[in-house]
Amino acid sequence: MCAIQRGLLSLARSAIGYNSTPSRFSSTYRHTPMHRSCTRIAVAFLLLLSAFTNAAGAATAASQIVESELPNGMRVIVKSDHRAPVVVCMVWYRVGSIDERSGTTGVAHVLEHMLFKGTKAVPAGEFSRIIAEAGGRDNAFTSRDYTGYFQTLHKSQLGLALRLESDRMVNALIAPDEFAKEIKVVMEERRWRTDDRPRALVYEQLNAAAYRAHPYRNPVIGWMSDLEAMRVEDAREFYNAWYAPNNATLVVVGDVTAEEVLKLARQHFGPIARKTLPLRRITQEPQQLGPQDLTVRAPAELPYVLMAYKAPVLRDPDAEWEPYALEMLANVLDGNEAARLNRTLVRTQRIASSASASYDGVARGPGMFHLSATPTPGKTARELEEALRGEIAKLIAEGVTEEELQRVKSQAVASHVYERDSMFYQAQQIGSLAMAGLPHRLIDLFVEKLKAVTADQVTEVARKYLVDSGLTVAYLDPQPLSGKRPAAPPPGVRHAQ
């Protein structure tokens, strides 16, 4: 199996509910009871895999994106892709941890759990069973900016998915007994996902320091003290405030037409009344006035360093080309085995066992450019920080060669093309852009914007944003291992990004 095939197989697994890791700093997990035979699982998987493993060029032949809005304010976005009789159906709510009140961190994620705990029409646990019996897979995810629910299934079952989703948009029970059980699941999830994982602790602590005022400083899964104090009324209040058609976007990608989807959307979501949404009062992040660092002491085998620089995002009115140049900068540093960090720190100097750079410009709040690395035995996290700084200084002083940039561009564009061959990835792109307040036309513009980035622009964004005045550094100081970390998530874990 070639690298491209492995990548497409991974995308297909992600699309049908396998554990996946969408980014360096966000893990996605959920265990859902599946009451169906191995044969049905195999058939569903092969059906979906066939949809994702056609030639990459097929993605460009797909129909254009069609967007509509129901009278109640719900957005409906459809992208036809007729390569297989499959649809990916996603309902996105523009509410995440960014919208939580102080003292209730984690409630967006807890509510995501509760929406699988039944309505008057669909008892607890039945949602996933019904989708499974129809030959599909369902899942959900919570992030800083949004909460999403999705199903991947045969196109003939789209109406079933929309009926179930419209039901829980307004009829979720959020019963006290189910909440009491589920909050314990979430607390155990936090222990497994963060408290027992030293690098996750480093990332959590860095965010809390780097964002002084903005709610991005809070973990999506919530602080343990807030989870322990959370009441069922908190989840109900959050649900009643934010789960409304005028705060939701339906995204469907697959073997359907826009007319078919819109007809079903009107049937199932049209009768739901719009709501007056709460006023979003999000504290703006003050300007950082100097570098800051912190040390996290936790049981671990190796040290680790994580660096975060304040950076713009696509929705910033003055950003223009800068987010695309930052994307190219991340690829120059860490786009492949021959990229600068791996070539210099790992293979030549051998002071790091791994080193990475990452940037994500799709967000409702302020952005970050991350560098991270694990030192080799005998080296410290602070020594590795200096080496990372040295690579940045060298790039700023000497610039990026045109040959280097063209190689990175080719790889980035190829990766984007193959990712777009996945129906699930297409739906993810459309939904995440919508939640950030960005037009879906950016999907088609993305490759051209990357191609237009110049070597001077890559150097310029490095010089402008990778500076001490916007830097926060977190070091992991490994402590003796006191016990074995759980190898698998606890039962009932759902998505939290």
Regions found by a protein language model. Name each.
Residues 7, 15-17, 57:
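Residue-identity detector for glycine
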Residues 3, 12-15:
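Acidic, Ala/Val/Gly-enriched low-complexity intrinsically disordered segments
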Residues 7-11, 21, 29-45:
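Bacterial N-terminal signal peptides that target proteins for export
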Residues 117-122, 169-177, 193, 400-401:
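Short, polar/flexible loop-turn hinges at active-site or ligand-entry regions and domain interfaces
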Residues 42-54:
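Bacterial N-terminal signal peptides
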Residues 57-97, 121-157, 193-247, 271-316, ...:
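Non-catalytic beta-strand/loop surface segments
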